[in-house]
Amino acid sequence: MRWSGRAHVFGDDVDTDQIIPGRCLRRVSYDELGRYAMTGADPEFPEKVREGDVIVAGKNFGCGSSREQAVMALQQAGVACVVARSFARIFYRNAINRGLPTVEAEEDPTEVVEDGNRVTVDLDELVLRAGSEEVPLREPPEFALQAWREGGLLELVKKNPDKPPWRD
């Protein structure tokens, strides 16, 4: 699996209220969430992001309240993948469930990648590339890879109802 796009770089402890502010949840339908993605951290993000772009972040991305809409907002904004030093577990599981690739880096990718860099996330080689710079990536669990390939856990289970991935 591989994704290439422009990097949007954020620091440590990006919480779900920065990913999709709570005030937006009462005013918009699910289909409109992408218009407000990351506006708690960067109000201009929805205008800057393009289909296939990659979010690069520090530690504890997606912390805060359990908010499935945070993942949905990123997907609807066109984000192809999120690479971070670490993820809050609830966000990470929501991302697997919804089919948004979330890949942990072995070292802080924000020390190498700059906002606007063209990056490639290569899971075959377990590396994030930004020009001549590389950041090693942790190998995601097999069930996460399967869910990402199918577009989420629900789609994976629909295609394999007699063999859910958690039984392996």
Curated annotation (Swiss-Prot):
Keywords of this entry: Amino-acid biosynthesis, Branched-chain amino acid biosynthesis, Leucine biosynthesis, Lyase
Domain of life assignment: Archaea
UniProt xrefs under Pfam families: Aconitase_C
EC number: 4.2.1.33
UniProt keyword Glycoprotein, yes or no: no
Molecular function terms from GO: 3-isopropylmalate dehydratase activity
Pathway: Amino-acid biosynthesis; L-leucine biosynthesis; L-leucine from 3-methyl-2-oxobutanoate: step 2/4
GO annotation, biological process: L-leucine biosynthetic process
Catalyzed chemical reaction(s): (2R,3S)-3-isopropylmalate = (2S)-2-isopropylmalate
Keyword Lipid metabolism in record: no
PANTHER family named among the record's database cross-references: 3-ISOPROPYLMALATE DEHYDRATASE SMALL SUBUNIT 1, 3-ISOPROPYLMALATE DEHYDRATASE SMALL SUBUNIT 2-RELATED-RELATED
HAMAP family: LeuD_type2
Family affiliation: Belongs to the LeuD family. LeuD type 2 subfamily.
Function: Catalyzes the isomerization between 2-isopropylmalate and 3-isopropylmalate, via the formation of 2-isopropylmaleate.
Subunit structure: Heterodimer of LeuC and LeuD.
The name this protein goes by in its record: 3-isopropylmalate dehydratase small subunit 2
Taxonomic source organism: Methanopyrus kandleri (strain AV19 / DSM 6324 / JCM 9639 / NBRC 100938)
Lineage: Archaea, Methanobacteriati, Methanobacteriota, Methanomada group, Methanopyri
